[in-house]
């Protein structure tokens, strides 16, 4: 495990750095393998970076992306991460955005659909961009969720699992589909992007103690052989 920490003066500088890194990794993937595969976090922090990335010159027809996790809501719902990605990256003409859920957001059907989709994209992600909540969750790996143990199991090969946060976050009280820890770690570049002092304090706790049950993000930060680039701004 290794951590490379990048401090930025403000959220704008953070977004610029994320966009540049995503673009660079996509260009490298296209040059070396002819295609690129991304897993992208929802939440407010990374979306300015996605808009900047979408405006960059790239052969988007050879790029596929998916959310790192999704709320089990219809694809047109305001809480849907896929909808947010579509809107942010509308200028990335040709980009294939892969959903983790069915169009109606049924949780059980979505779990099965996500696993089938991941079977078609079995290779390593070129970039996984993660966020983190003040409870230490990343993607939808929430502390206290009954399925957390399954999602953290390094031997799981299905790649995605239904998550029922307990308690449900009041701002988004929905079941989720999340990529598992092992699928998130199957990546050439892993980025964790956070803002604010409160999340910085949680990050320091997760870095200090490898306790994924308390801080699920620790499963990524302390994974053997993984290098995580942590981008932070006040």
What do these predicted ranges mean?
Residues 1-38:
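N-terminal glycine-/serine-/threonine-rich phosphate-binding loop
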Residues 2, 61-129:
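Ligand-binding beta-strand-loop-alpha-helix segment within the catalytic cores
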Residues 34-41, 126-128:
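Short glycine-rich phosphate-binding loop at a beta-alpha junction
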Residues 40-45, 130-134, 195:
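Glycine-rich beta-strand-to-loop/alpha-helix junction loops that act as flexible
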Residues 52-60, 83-87, 143-152, 208:
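A glycine- and small-aliphatic-rich helix-loop capping segment at beta-alpha/alpha-beta transitions
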Residues 61, 68, 75-76, 123, ...:
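Active-site histidine-anchored catalytic micro-motif
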Residues 134-182:
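Class I SAM-dependent methyltransferase SAM-binding "motif I" and its flanking Rossmann-like core
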Residues 179-182, 186-234:
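ATP/nucleoside-binding phosphotransfer catalytic cores, i.e., glycine-rich phosphate-binding loops
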């Amino acid at each position: 495990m290794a951590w490379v920490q990048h401090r930025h003066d403000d959220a704008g500088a953070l977004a610029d750095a994320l966009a540049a890194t995503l673009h660079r990794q996509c260009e490298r993937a296209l040059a070396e393998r002819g295609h690129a595969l991304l897993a992208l976090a929802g939440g407010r922090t990374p979306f300015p970076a996605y808009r900047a990335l979408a405006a960059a010159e790239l052969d988007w027809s050879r790029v596929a992306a998916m959310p790192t996790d999704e709320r089990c809501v219809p694809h047109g719902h305001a809480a849907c991460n896929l909808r947010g990605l579509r809107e942010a990256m509308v200028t990335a003409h040709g980009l294939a955005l892969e959903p983790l859920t069915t169009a109606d957001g049924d949780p059980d059907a979505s779990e099965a659909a996500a696993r089938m989709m991941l079977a078609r994209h079995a290779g390593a992600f070129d970039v996984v961009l993660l966020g983190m909540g003040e409870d230490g969750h990343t993607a939808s790996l929430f502390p206290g969720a009954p399925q957390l143990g399954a999602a953290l199991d390094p031997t799981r090969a299905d790649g995605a699992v239904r998550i029922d946060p307990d308690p449900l976050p009041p701002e988004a009280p929905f079941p989720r589909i999340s990529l598992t820890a092992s699928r998130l770690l199957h990546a050439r570049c892993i980025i964790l992007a956070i803002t604010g002092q409160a999340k910085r304090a949680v990050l320091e706790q997760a870095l200090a103690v490898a306790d994924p049950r308390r801080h699920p993000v620790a499963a990524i930060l302390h994974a053997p052989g993984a290098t995580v680039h942590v981008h932070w701004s006040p």
